[in-house]
């Protein structure tokens, strides 16, 4: 299943690199750092505590710690850029965000390899628990933001979007300390399914898009009320970013919900059981469906 997932992602990555040039260097860098980590490990997980580059930079835990620190620093510099009208501050925030994404994805790839070093029966794609999906959420939200930043040519929204990412990595660090959540654990039987490998990433593309649109809507409301109005993009640009983010998120969330129902039918014998998670997924879906309907049919605009 893992090999099939990796092969299946190749066309998507090729398409991404074709349409978005910065992603090409990012993907190549992730591949180089991941392969370097595998080479340094030499098939021995204990080297994570003895090999210098693994211990301080490239083991999954170290890379994710770097990701977290860099996201927080990026948030600070984006706010400096916004409040002080400093282009250099925002530019530093942008570069730090790119490096954070690089370290985060490298950490996930290395964590995938580390799980197989523990045991072939333990190895799994790292999207199986709260620790791993919070890393994934942070990375997807950051990547989506970087795409829109480049597309619209403005860095002023980084101060808002990076706030929610910093909150996520703050929770991630607390969760690691309080629950020792960074430790790789075997999958419970219900998660030993290939559905997990496509359901979870699709879900978190949706969550990341919704989070981004929520923070852009905060900027929209501030602009509308004259707060930092001269430092933010036009209302039309903010509205367009919100709409596109919600549309992308809704599409992926719909796909993920359908995949989740199919997974539930295979694991528990029923497509829908009205448990709290499923019920709230439906509420979220209906909420965004109503918003998109009002926009497309009634011309609704704004936050």
Write out the residue ranges for each language-model feature:
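P-loop NTPase nucleotide-binding/switch module
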Residues: 232
């Amino acid at each position: 299943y893992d090999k099939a997932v990796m092969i299946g992602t190749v066309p998507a990555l090729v398409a991404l690199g074709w349409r978005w040039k910065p992603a090409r260097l990012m993907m190549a860098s992730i591949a180089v750092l991941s392969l370097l980590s595998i080479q340094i490990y030499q098939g021995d997980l204990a080297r994570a505590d003895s090999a210098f580059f693994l211990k301080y930079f490239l083991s999954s835990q170290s890379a994710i710690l770097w990701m977290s620190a860099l996201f927080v620093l990026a948030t600070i510099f984006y706010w400096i850029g916004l409040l002080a009208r400093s282009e250099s501050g925002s530019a530093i925030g942008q570069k730090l965000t790119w490096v954070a994404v690089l370290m985060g994805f490298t950490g996930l790839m290395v964590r995938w390899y580390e799980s197989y070093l523990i045991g072939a029966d333990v190895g799994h794609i790292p999207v199986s628990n709260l620790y791993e999906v919070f890393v994934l959420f942070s990375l997807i939200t950051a990547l989506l933001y970087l795409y829109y930043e480049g597309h619209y040519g403005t860095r002023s929204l980084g101060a808002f979007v990076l706030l929610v990412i910093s909150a996520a990595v703050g929770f991630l660090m607390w969760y690691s300390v309080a629950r020792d959540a960074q430790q790789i654990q075997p999958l419970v039987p219900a998660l030993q399914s290939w559905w997990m490998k496509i359901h979870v990433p699709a879900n978190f593309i949706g969550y990341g898009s919704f989070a981004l649109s929520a923070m852009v809507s905060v900027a929209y409301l501030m602009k509308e009320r004259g707060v930092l109005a001269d430092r933010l993009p036009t209302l039309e640009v903010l509205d367009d970013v919100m709409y596109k983010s919600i549309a992308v998120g809704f599409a992926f969330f719909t796909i993920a919900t359908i995949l989740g129902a199919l997974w539930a039918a295979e694991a528990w014998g029923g497509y829908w059981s009205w448990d709290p998670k499923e019920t709230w997924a439906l509420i979220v879906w209906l909420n965004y469906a109503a918003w998109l309907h009002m926009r497309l049919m009634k011309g609704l605009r704004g936050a």
